[in-house]
């Protein structure tokens, strides 16, 4: 049977499949046609995201049905070394007790005029982990 896969760009892909094909197989066919890796594909039918292990018949997908292809969002956490560097840079500072200005770790007086360049400084508190 023939089904259609519509991408977010509006392009429609035609696939020849069987009702017994798994969603993984459909994603592999999309990869063959479009070059999009299956791990980045999300298929939506009738408002539901299709799971890899299930078949087309499980979702009542019949001939000439249209699936919607959405790509997985990239990104995530920072590399541990970058996270440690950011933590060090943001936490090892001094704070003026009068105007709460953030100052470099070796500062002895505040740089702001509104507190009269106070020498009342404290270390910035460490965030809770």
UniProtKB/Swiss-Prot annotation:
UniProt cross-references to SUPFAM superfamilies, sorted A to Z: Ubiquitin-like, Zn-binding ribosomal proteins
Cross-link (Glycyl lysine isopeptide (Lys-Gly) (interchain with G-Cter in ubiquitin)): 48
Keyword Protein biosynthesis carried by entry: no
UniProt keyword Plastid present: no
UniProt domain Ubiquitin-like: residue ranges: 1-76
Record location of the Glycyl lysine isopeptide (Gly-Lys) (interchain with K-? in acceptor proteins) cross-link: 76
Top-level taxon in the UniProt lineage: Eukaryota
Keywords: Cytoplasm, Isopeptide bond, Nucleus, Ribonucleoprotein, Ribosomal protein, Ubl conjugation
GO biological process: translation
GO molecular function: structural constituent of ribosome
SMART domains on file: Ribosomal_L40e, UBQ
A GO cellular component entry from the record: cytoplasm
Other comments on record: Ubiquitin is generally synthesized as a polyubiquitin precursor. Some ubiquitin genes contain a single copy of ubiquitin fused to a ribosomal protein.
Entry similarity comment: In the N-terminal section; belongs to the ubiquitin family.
Protein name per the record: Ubiquitin-ribosomal protein eL40 fusion protein
Species whose genome carries this gene: Tetrahymena thermophila (strain SB210)
Gene name for this UniProt entry: RPL40
């Amino acid at each position: 049977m023939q089904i259609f896969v519509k991408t977010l760009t509006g392009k429609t892909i035609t696939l020849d499949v069987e009702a017994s094909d798994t969603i993984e197989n459909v994603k592999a066919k999309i990869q063959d046609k479009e070059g999009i890796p299956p791990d980045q594909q999300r298929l939506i039918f009738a408002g539901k995201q299709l799971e890899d292990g299930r078949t087309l018949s499980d979702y009542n997908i019949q001939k000439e049905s249209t699936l919607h292809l959405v790509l997985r969002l990239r990104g995530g956490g920072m590399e541990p070394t970058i996270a440690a560097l950011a933590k060090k840079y943001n936490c090892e500072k001094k704070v003026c007790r009068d105007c709460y200005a953030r100052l470099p770790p070796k500062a002895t007086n505040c740089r702001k005029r509104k507190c009269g360049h106070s020498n009342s400084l404290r270390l910035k508190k460490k965030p809770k982990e």
